[in-house]
Amino acid sequence: MAKKVAAIVKLQVPAGKATPAPPVGPALGQHGVNIMAFVKEFNDRTASQAGLIIPVEITVYEDRSFTFITKTPPAAVLLKKALGIETASGEPNRKKVGKVSREKIREIAEMKMKDLNAASIEAAMRMIEGTARSMGVEVEA
């Protein structure tokens, strides 16, 4: 018989740098999960992606065991990394922070394709372009 799910916890944690401190500790502690076991396993799985923020979906079962799925980093994080900027524009319609090429958009869209709700790579590219525009990043035609 399948285990009964007690909770699903969604977090965004820096790759390879999970600690029992907030936000991880309190989110898992309230469900009685062994926090150190999660931290160790998450850091081992994401060590190769250092510097990126990784969304993780933790499924907690009634017997306090857990499983988790790591997803691809958010599009905004990938765009900031591609452009080498720290923060996006506070006023995206007035102040632009950089330009991104269609090739870079395609690369990011291909990387995120499995997590996006898009039927084609073109649709995924349009989603990434929308994220870029909302961050104050110009998309080269």
From Swiss-Prot:
Gene3D superfamilies: Ribosomal protein L11, C-terminal domain (1.10.10.250), Ribosomal protein L11/L12, N-terminal domain (3.30.1550.10). Coiled coil: none annotated. The keyword Nucleotide-binding does not apply. GO terms for cellular component: cytosolic large ribosomal subunit. Forms part of the ribosomal stalk which helps the ribosome interact with GTP-bound translation factors. HAMAP family: Ribosomal_uL11. Part of the ribosomal stalk of the 50S ribosomal subunit. Interacts with L10 and the large rRNA to form the base of the stalk. L10 forms an elongated spine to which L12 dimers bind in a sequential fashion forming a multimeric L10(L12)X complex. NCBIfam families: L11_bact. This is Large ribosomal subunit protein uL11. The lineage of its organism: Bacteria, Bacillati, Bacillota, Clostridia, Moorellales.
